[in-house]
Design a protein with these regions (language model features):
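Glycine-rich, flexible N-terminal cofactor/catalytic loop recognition
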Residues: 1-58
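Loop/turn-to-beta-strand initiation segments
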Residues: 3-4, 73-77, 153-154
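Short active-site oxyanion
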Residues: 25-31, 102-106, 154-155
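General beta-strand structural signal in soluble alpha/beta enzymes
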Residues: 33, 80, 107-110, 157, ...
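Conserved helicase motor
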Residues: 53-61, 134-138
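Short glycine-cluster motifs
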Residues: 72-135
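A short, charged helix-loop
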Residues: 129-150, 216
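A contiguous loop/helix-start segment that scaffolds small-molecule binding in enzyme catalytic cores
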Residues: 154, 158-266
């Protein structure tokens, strides 16, 4: 049965593509590409002559029916401008339409700027939130950041070079001076990964160029208070002044946030 293949392609270096992906592109009846120029560059590099059609944000409605019709006759390979289709691009809508028609959907995994940036960021990767491209307008951007400000997981976002400084200013305002890894031109000749704080990044990227993936530290858990020598001394002083053990513990709990159990054990 004809199948829709969701094919990951390189995010920069053309060598970052699997043999399975190349075979799928070669054998498909049609390739639906978000950016035909970039995809043709990849196909030419590997001598692939499969017919290609454009499928991007501004023609997705008019092209959807055509691509579904082609799927009645043979396999279609969906590719994005770079990386894995369906992430911040119209590929998602084609997948939904294929699913509604019970067309088999198979992923051909591979490059992803999100995972690549996380892997080299030096920030926690056990839990993360991807928020796509940051909104263009400052007000919307701040509201978007505020909605995830309390999340403890790492945050990943895309940003254009001409808006990077504005985005960093809003990051600092809404999230504070958190640790960040700002990845530029990943896998390309001039790849660069900046690791530091938001304020340091503001100073570093005076004239930003290229494509940026931002990896932002999640909200840090407040450090739990500990039973220190001073606290033990405070307990003894309270008891010496006539307070019962229960009263002394209650007062210290109120002042320090320590648990009663910890204080009774001390």
């Amino acid at each position: 049965m004809p199948t829709l293949y969701v094919v990951a392609t390189p995010i920069g270096n053309l060598e970052d593509i699997s043999q399975r992906a190349l075979r799928t592109l070669r054998e498909a009846k049609l390739i639906a590409a978000e950016d035909t120029r970039k995809t043709k560059r990849l196909l030419n590099a590997y001598n692939i002559t499969t017919h290609i059609t454009s499928y991007y944000e501004h023609n997705k409605k008019s092209k959807l029916g055509y691509i579904l019709k082609q799927l009645e006759e043979g396999d279609v390979a969906l590719v994005s401008e770079a990386g894995t289709p369906g992430i911040s691009d119209p590929g998602y809508e084609l997948v939904v339409a294929a699913r509604e028609k019970d067309i088999p959907i198979v992923a051909i995994p591979g490059p992803s700027a999100i995972v690549t940036a996380l892997a080299v960021s030096g920030l926690p990767t056990d839990r993360f939130t991807y928020i796509g491209f940051l909104p263009r307008k400052s007000g919307e951007r701040r509201r978007s950041l505020q909605s995830i400000a309390d999340g403890v997981g790492t945050i990943v976002a895309f940003e254009a070079p001409h808006r990077l400084q504005e985005a960093l200013a809003d990051l600092l305002l809404v999230l504070g001076d958190r640790r960040v890894a700002i990845c530029r031109q990943l896998t390309k000749l001039h790849e660069e990964v900046f690791r530091g704080t938001v304020s340091q990044a503001q100073q570093y990227f005076k004239e930003p160029r290229g494509e940026f993936t931002l990896v932002i530290e999640g909200k840090r858990d407040k450090e739990k208070p500990k039973v220190t020598g001073d606290i033990l001394k405070q307990l003894k002083t309270l008891k010496a002044s006539g307070a019962t053990a229960r009263e002394a513990v209650a007062k210290v709990v109120l002042e320090t946030g320590l648990s009663r159990k910890e204080l009774y054990r001390a």
